[in-house]
Amino acid sequence: MPRIFNLARRMAGPDAADELTQDVFVRAWQKLALFRGESSFATWLHRLAVNVIIERFRTLGTARERFLADSEAVLEVAHATRTKHLDLNMDLQAAIAQLPHGARTVFVLHDVEGYKHEEIGDILGVSAGTSKSQLHRARQTLRVLLRKEA
């Protein structure tokens, strides 16, 4: 469960992580009969989680901008109250949360979760090249954001 929650937190932010984690386990219960054992259960559950989270962003449609604006407001408040003694992990998490949705999704799937660009492309419905460019953009943005924090 912590792995699914952490994935949801990284991809969608801390406010949505609890609800998305619950949605993943509800969906897993509903789809359990479809588990064929071709991979480990953890791998199947993780892939299901990625799909549920991405589906949530797709169904948000125009509400997605409002969701992202709310996330930005939370980040602004969090940034204003931060002390000088936060560790690099907290700075990195805040920087990841500031990435545009597409770049953040690719970054988390590739660099954090270990997916290959071809797998990411299949999940997101984009080419491997698009995944690579999104990852490059995410890494560049993170460098800039983390330099500002230093």
Put a short name on every predicted segment.
Residues 5-23, 128, 150:
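Short, charged helix-capping/linker segments at alpha-helix termini
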Residues 10-14, 23-40, 59-63:
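Sigma70-family region 2
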Residues 33-36, 50-68, 85:
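Arg/Lys-rich amphipathic alpha helix in sigma70-family domain 2
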Residues 58, 104, 139-150:
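Short, Lys/Arg-enriched C-terminal cap helix and immediately downstream tail that follows
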Residues 106-110:
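A short pre-motif secondary-structure segment
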Residues 116, 125-130:
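Helix-turn-helix DNA-binding motif, specifically the short coil turn and the N-cap/start of the second
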